[in-house]
Amino acid sequence: DNSSITTDQGANVLRISAQKSNSGSYTSAKLTTKNFVSVRFRRVDVRAKMTSGKGLWPAIWMLGNNIKDISWPGCGEIDIAEMLGHEPNKMYATLHYTNGENKHEEVQGSKELSDIKFSDAYHVFSVDWDHEKITFLLDNTQVNQVPIAADMKEFLRSFYLILNVAV
């Protein structure tokens, strides 16, 4: 069921929305490039207007292609931009991985806008990734930069892109 995904052909807009069902529960959607397009050591830009509201969790993120073989967080996760709906002016950029002791580790940066919400206007959320570091950007301004350490081997492999709104 793709009813939570709509397009506006004239503006090249793809909209993911949360919808309340007759039973009172909510549904949303997830778009993924898994099995179609994967990237490694590239820059990825996504122009988006994020949703806001209590209980919503919009995200632009990537998972390692080998998630079926290694599982999370061993496959690695690159959160280009995540928001919590009750914090409409704050975005998070995070890496999740398995450290040298085989435990979940994360490195997180964030950016808070002082005068507007991420749902008020379109922004470009980016990750610029090479074999030495991963840089997160908002509207071409650096939010966080993480060197790829020896125990972060996940980030030397290919990843696929995911766009979603969790409820």
Residue ranges and their predicted role:
Residues 1-167:
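GH16 jelly-roll
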